[in-house]
Amino acid sequence: MTNHVPEATKPASGDYAWLGAEAGSVADLMYMLNTEDWYDAINSRFVSELLDDTLPESILKAYLIQDFKFYNNGMMARLIKLAPRQETKDMLAAQSQWFADNEATYFEHFLEAYHVSQEEYDATEPTPANKEYGAYLDSLSDKSWPELITEICCMEWLYLAWAKRTVDADVIQQVPAHKGWVDLHEGAHFRKWVGDLISLVNEYCSIDGPEAEVFRTIVHLERRFFDDSYPQE
């Protein structure tokens, strides 16, 4: 019998002070300006069914194929190039290698375990939200360091937030693909990574700059990406 993972609670200022987003910090203010979409994203049907091990295989396959196509969009290379300090470049480069060693490997094992052929992979059409999300990420490719660091911070932070639901509930998924996806987005390594990104947002970004709109848009598109995982009537 599946253990049910409860919904996350309503967002509040200082929720992520333990990651460096103290109440009133730039990162916390961005978070608090987008609580509705954030709450809906991390408690979405897709996330809840994945955490409860009730997600239909067809939905998981379609979602992960589209997510994998995002993987090689060059975001990390641009971040490393624009990073203002060598230590930041080194941190980002190390995480980029971690993605290659762990996330890419997860995708490859998933495609093999679920017998996803190259033909099926290529034929999987992006959802409307996926198309919009991809176009938006492409539009950020020539933007400033504050906008780009906000982009990746928001994406990774939101994923940690939904994965944290199952840790808080002390529930371990029994479907390997579900557990593997959670494990990629929770744990000491991923928490440190998100904390490092939050620290950079606090240092280089402003709630009055264009990066605040980047945060808002990413949260909105992440919610729609989850919702669009299901056939739309």
Which sequence ranges carry the predicted segments?
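A cross-kingdom marker for long, charged
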Residues: 215-233
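Extended amphipathic alpha-helical scaffold segments
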Residues: 41-42, 72-77, 105, 194-201
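Active-site-proximal alpha-helical scaffolds that flank and shape metal-associated catalytic sites
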Residues: 10, 18, 28, 65, ...
